[in-house]
C-alpha cells in the first residue's frame, strides 16, 4: 500500500473514509477497525466485521496524526472503526487556537 498525499482510502469493515494529508516517513500500514484500509475504488470484502477492541470510531472533518511515523490523514466520512497504524491507535489532532484579533 503506497500512502501518497491526496490518495483516498476506505475501511474494509465500516463506513470510514480518509484522505492522506502527510505520508508516513517510512513504510507503514494504515488500518481501520482492525483491518488494513483499501483503495477508495475497491469493493469492500463480504463477511468481515470490526475487530474487537477497534470500535472507538472516527469523525468526519477531523485530522488523525501519528507522531512516530509522521503520517496525517483527514477523515472524510464517519465510521465505527478505530484508525490505527500497525495496530497502534492514532488520535485526532487538536484544533489550533487562533490568535485574538482586535
Where are these regions (language model features)?
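A low-complexity, Ser/Thr/Gly/Pro-enriched, surface-exposed linker/loop concept
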Residues: 24-56, 90-97
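Long, hydrophobic N-terminal alpha-helical segment
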Residues: 1-15
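A short, compositionally biased
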Residues: 2-5, 57-60, 77-78
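Generalized protein targeting/export and membrane-interface segments
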Residues: 12, 21-23, 78
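Short acidic DE-rich linear segments
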Residues: 100-102
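Short hydrophobic interaction/assembly module
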Residues: 45-74
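Short, compact, well-ordered microdomains
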Residues: 65-98
Amino acid at each position: 500500500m503506497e500512502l501518497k498525499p491526496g490518495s483516498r482510502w476506505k475501511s474494509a469493515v465500516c463506513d470510514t473514509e480518509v484522505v492522506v494529508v502527510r505520508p508516513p516517513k517510512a513504510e507503514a500500514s494504515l488500518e481501520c477497525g482492525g483491518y488494513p484500509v483499501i483503495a477508495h475504488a475497491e469493493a469492500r470484502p463480504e463477511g468481515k466485521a470490526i475487530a474487537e477492541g477497534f470500535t472507538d470510531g472516527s469523525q468526519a472533518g477531523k485530522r488523525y496524526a501519528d507522531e512516530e511515523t509522521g503520517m496525517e490523514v483527514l477523515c472524510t466520512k464517519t465510521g465505527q472503526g478505530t484508525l490505527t497504524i500497525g495496530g497502534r491507535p492514532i488520535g485526532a489532532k487538536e484544533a489550533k487556537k487562533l490568535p485574538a484579533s482586535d
